[in-house]
Amino acid sequence: MDTYSINPASIIDEAVDLSMRLTGTDFPVSIFPSKIQRIISEVHECHNYPTDYIAAAILTAIAVGIGNTHLAQIKQGWIESPILYIALIGRPGANKSHPLSFAMKPFLDYDYQQNQVFEKALAKYDELMSMSRKERADNGEEQFPQEPVRKRFLISDVTPEGLSLIHAQNKRGLCLWADELSAWFKNFNRYNNGSEEQFWLSVFSAKTTISDRKNAKSSIFIKRPYISVIGTIQKKILSELAKGERSSNGFIDRILFVMPNLQQKARWNDKELPENIEQEWNTIIDKLIQQEYALNEFGEIEPQILLFTEDAKRRLYEWQHHFSELCDRETNDTIVSIYCKLEIYIIRFCLIIQLARWTCGECDKTYIDLLTVERAIKLTEYFKESALSVQNILNENALNSQQQAIVNLLPPAFTTTQAIQIAEQNGMKERTFQRFLNDNIGTLFRKEKHGEYSKINP
């Protein structure tokens, strides 16, 4: 059974989350340092963006700022990068894109500045290459000038081959920012059938990638890729994401879904964002960007490895044992697969949360401590519930009219006898309904005890 440590910090965290739930937000904003909590609150109050979207975008931005500079180690040989695949789900006009623009602005500014530097360096390079070697030597220039590379964090639509080249030039990491995620996964088969999807499956696990370019003498070798993905998707096209092999190969299970309970259209107001809020956010991300890191003899980043304190590791193991019991009781393989991916994500969350606290001066980054683990558990529970909600939507989309009518008529909690009666009133035989009920445990329904069930999304 899960036990929670009682301390002043955890009490404050609970109070913060309770106040947020009263406003219709389920995202556990308390996982962030107080400085970032204030940024989220001010952006929400000023622009009326859903808090879930703002918080998820900020979580991703911090992960991207860390990139390959730090890793979390749970035990010898098991290390995790802060790679996130996040989808913001909502109706058209639900302000999904604007929170992303706010969170990613420090990277946009950095990329713009670096592009200016690159353009000047490229012009100089082209000028030198137009000279002969003798002319370069006579002018005191290098005889064999090196072609400049563009430093960046953000990418949009790009092929795996092009992405590998960009990543080779930016080894600390990248972020694929897709305003419409549907364009991302619909392009998976545009060149080689399934190869792009396999590329992203490998990247998620930070597996070494090798890209063999046409007409090139050498391959692009990325020892430890770091590419996070974030974007938006409309609720009505979620089923597109689950098409093909993306359900069976576990691709969809790697995506963290953010779907606010309240999706009202934002009301305009006269409130202005305090001038220091954007600057505070820039300062936090800039602290991550400007971190120094070691390079080995081959020019590869030597990341700082964060271990867990003993009490933090003990708490994490306790949570995992309880989570494993959920898996053992679960009869739906799709749900089990989701739970298994969350066991990977919780370690990544620990790394991101610890570094977020460090940027705000609330802790050091020598170890991952107990408070960070407690907060990572809350975040994992949030994404677990979101994943179950998405599975429920996917299953509802696949229902025929008879099945949908029965689901709609079932009360939030029901007995087998009640359900069979409703099914028969709608023309479904008892045996057919029993099979339908059993097939959808964990997606549409939850078994409370023998003969008693509840709807996952009443």
Indicate residue ranges for each PLM-predicted region.
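Phosphate-handling catalytic cores of nucleic-acid transaction enzymes
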Residues: 2-458
